[in-house]
């Protein structure tokens, strides 16, 4: 409902090697927005070939900033290198984070161990700071190894919100609305379904 008037979107990929693939994902997302009544007139994709002043302009003028999935740590380094974190943190428009993008929205971001995806150890690092907790996308409540050995120890210091696949959550300031799916709080060695 609050996106109906949006006309411009800026995408920030989580993978930069295959820009044709990124463009296909962007095209799919733009089509999805159109299907729900959001007709975007300006679509921008940031990458290493985008001039810095153009990046800044695209972020500042975007009605929607869409931080895509992909390589979480590489995306974080991209945001740091071009000094985009503060701009995204302070943006007045809508910010959407998917998978890696959701992780990077946190003040303290958590990239959990996933050997299948080339992440051999769980790390925490400074994220965008748009939200004051961290998101664990693709969360599987039955993955006890991840819960017991990775997430529970970290949950003593930070709140982790676990979002299983196909979950959508709308966050406004400190409030959230579950759009679809389940939403879990992992904190102080426990898991609570919200």
Language-model features, listed with the residues they occupy:
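Flexible gly/pro-rich beta->alpha loop and the following alpha-helix that scaffold active-site loops
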Residues: 41-94
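Class I SAM-dependent methyltransferase SAM-binding "motif I" and its flanking Rossmann-like core
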Residues: 74-78, 82-141
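Short loop/turn motifs at secondary-structure junctions
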Residues: 5, 37-39, 61, 156
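Extended, compositionally biased flexible segments
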Residues: 24-46
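C-terminal and late-domain segments of enzyme folds
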Residues: 1-5, 11-27, 32, 111-194
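A structural signal for short, well-ordered beta-strand segments and their strand-loop junctions
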Residues: 42, 96-98, 161-163
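Structural motif
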Residues: 10, 64-68, 96-97, 135
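A short beta-strand-loop structural module common to alpha/beta enzyme folds
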Residues: 8-15, 40-46
